[in-house]
Amino acid sequence: EFETLNTQANNAFKGVDRSVQLYDFSGSNPIEYRSMWEVQKSLVGAHVNRLKVEFQKIAPDTQFMDTDQLQLGASSSSVVGISDYMMIPEQEERIKSFDSLILLQHQPVYTLGTGSDSQFVKLDEERLESLGIDLIRIDRGGEVTYHGPGQLTAYPIFDQRGYKQDIHWYMRALEEAILIALENAGVQGAVREDNVTGVWMNGKKVAALGVKVKRWVTMHGLAVNVDHRSLGNFDGIVPCGLEGRDVGCVNDFLD
């Protein structure tokens, strides 16, 4: 549960409902990674514009992103419709927060964090192409991971000024959210492990985390391996750079 703090840094949010706008594409076709990365950056940009309004007194009609900025082209038709959910000026009175949560499945892709070591990718470029798996270096923390069908990926675009300005707290809160969701789904035995991020079951990693924070606005997030489809391409990498550690999926642990 995210706790709103009443600190001096959060004075601008006193009396403001911290509502979250949900974009749920988890039941749709898997989405190409780069397209949704651009959407994340657009949502973060909208947050930054809002902060300029609140703290620099910029005219209010500049705080809302033009929905045309989210038109991603014909090659990205799998995300057509997300602009319909974007905030526009006439929605100003109804929207209390720019916090957003995107749920989706991705097309097969390996992502490397900013400082990730490419030695943890076992496949060469030719093999990746034959398998139809993209390899992308992105702007999050953490080592290499895999996204694909059968995996629930969540991208919280949250302004931490409305919660707690502590990245370690945020990472633990994401883990806690996964643990609570699994428990509510009847999945028993999910735990944290000391000195490593993520959620584990019977020694296998079922959920991974990797985030970026810009001006205390978060992007990227978490991925939960739900069914066996999510596991097929992990053998092409050393997941999260953890040698000798296995990955698993939630369905293996359902009663």
Question: For each predicted feature, which ranges?
Answer:
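Conserved phosphate/anionic-ligand binding catalytic regions in large, soluble enzymes, centered on
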Residues: 214-232
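Glycine-rich, charged/polar anion/phosphate-binding loops
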Residues: 205-213
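N-terminal lobe of the biotin/lipoate ligase/transferase fold
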Residues: 1-200, 205-206
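Short, acidic Gly/Pro/Ser/Thr-rich loop/turn segments
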Residues: 110-111, 119, 216, 231-233
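Residues immediately flanking
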Residues: 106-107, 114, 213, 226-228
